[in-house]
């Protein structure tokens, strides 16, 4: 494992911890899209079908369990916790996320590295993760005002993907035959979706003002 992969994993883990801190400590999910969280839960469920059959390392299995467990717990909190669910803005979070799921599934059935159930589901998870942030970004544009923890959560998610791109570049030049077009293209699309948010995030940090996205 290289430093970029480790930085990506730790940044991803930090993003989850920030969101759990907001939900568990403040007992609020205001500004958080349940649609995006449900998509992430589906991403990890379909990606880690091999969790109990293919052992790579203790680190790898631990990270899989953490991301799978945390994503499901966040969805549970937002749907069922008697206090947290009251802060969920259902009227604003109206992005039809099934319109993301179905095209990603069809694309995975057509474009994959091997036509097996696990491989198609893994490919589906890659495509879905690339666009899973869209309901969250739409929600933020509608509400405009973004609290610090939500802003940090989204920034860390974008940073995680950026580190993974650096990881791929590093491995391309240091490992023979390291070519994964599906992962690369999906990861690049995912990173580009954060570009607008990054711009306003750094402007807010530079000017020491509250983070707001244009409507």
From Swiss-Prot:
Q: Does the keyword Transmembrane helix apply?
A: yes
Task: Show which residues sit on the Cytoplasmic side of the membrane.
Answer: 22-35, 83-98, 140-151, 203-215
Q: Where in the cell is it found?
A: Endoplasmic reticulum membrane
Question: Sorted alphabetically, which Pfam families does this protein's record hold?
Answer: ER_lumen_recept (PF00810)
Question: GO molecular function: any one?
Answer: ER retention sequence binding
Membrane topology term reads:
Multi-pass membrane protein
From the record, give the transmembrane residue ranges.
3-21, 36-53, 62-82, 99-112, 120-139, 152-170, 182-202
Keyword annotations for this protein, in alphabetical order, are: Endoplasmic reticulum, ER-Golgi transport, Membrane, Protein transport, Receptor, Transmembrane, Transmembrane helix, Transport
The alphabetized list of GO BP terms reads: protein retention in ER lumen; protein transport; vesicle-mediated transport
Residues exposed to the Lumenal side: 1-2, 54-61, 113-119, 171-181
Entry GO terms, CC: endoplasmic reticulum membrane
Signal peptide: which range, if any?
none
Its biological purpose: Required for the retention of luminal endoplasmic reticulum proteins. Determines the specificity of the luminal ER protein retention system. Also required for normal vesicular traffic through the Golgi. This receptor recognizes H-D-E-L.
Q: Which family does it belong to?
A: Belongs to the ERD2 family.
- Classification via PANTHER family: ER LUMEN PROTEIN RETAINING RECEPTOR (PTHR10585)
Q: Give the protein's recorded name.
A: ER lumen protein-retaining receptor
